[in-house]
Structures are given as C-alpha cells and as structure tokens.
Amino acid sequence: KPRPHQFFGLM
C-alpha cells in the first residue's frame, strides 16, 4: 500500500 508521504512525492 502506498504511504501518505509517497502521495506527496507524486506531487
């Protein structure tokens, strides 16, 4: 599962 910090990395 992708972690919250990974979502921020996409942006």
Swiss-Prot record:
GO biological process: chemical synaptic transmission; neuropeptide signaling pathway; tachykinin receptor signaling pathway
Subcellular location: Secreted
GO CC aspect terms: extracellular region; synapse
Residues recorded with modification Methionine amide: 11
Top-rank taxon: Eukaryota
InterPro entries from the UniProt entry: Tachy_Neuro_lke_CS, Tachykinin_dom
A Pfam cross-reference name: Tachykinin
Keywords tagged on the record: Amidation, Neuropeptide, Neurotransmitter, Secreted
The family this protein is said to belong to: Belongs to the tachykinin family.
Function statement: Tachykinins are active peptides which excite neurons, evoke behavioral responses, are potent vasodilators and secretagogues, and contract (directly or indirectly) many smooth muscles.
Protein name: Substance P
Organism: Oncorhynchus mykiss (Rainbow trout)
